[in-house]
Amino acid sequence: MANICDTQYKVMGERKAVADLWNTLQTMEVNTKNVYLYKLAEHYGIDYEKMGISVRGHIYWAEFEADEDICLLSFDTESAWSACEEFFDELNKVLGGELSVSYREIECGCDIFYVHDEQGFFPEECCVSSSGEPFEDACEDIFDTCQDAIAKWCEKMGISQGDRT
């Protein structure tokens, strides 16, 4: 696959629509094996090729939570270059437009850190990607504020921020 975009999704909405998607993911054995987005598109009858929608990726983890008031489906994807938001918009239409889809996508190789948050799930302000000494392997860290990111970077580098902003 191309550069890999890691995206976390939080889906809320009408219980029937959220449960339908969760049941489909379970049928496709999510959390045991990858659920490829093109297979999900085919399951729901979405002609992604005709529509020019990217489904190049997979869901590798999912979790469903429900009580009397809230129905929440969380899942993570890896996709090529960027999130597949057009696919999930189309999936929402197929499920009756009853879903609220929030997501955070990160692909540092393409300078992507984007948040679409309808429910307040992703308060983070920035993402820092680094590799080499003193970071060992490449790392991506998400921070609530840019100031938190600067403080962490200064700590790892062993330097003082001083009066610099």
Predicted ranges, named:
Residues 1-165:
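Intrinsic low-complexity, intrinsically disordered or marginally ordered coil/linker segments
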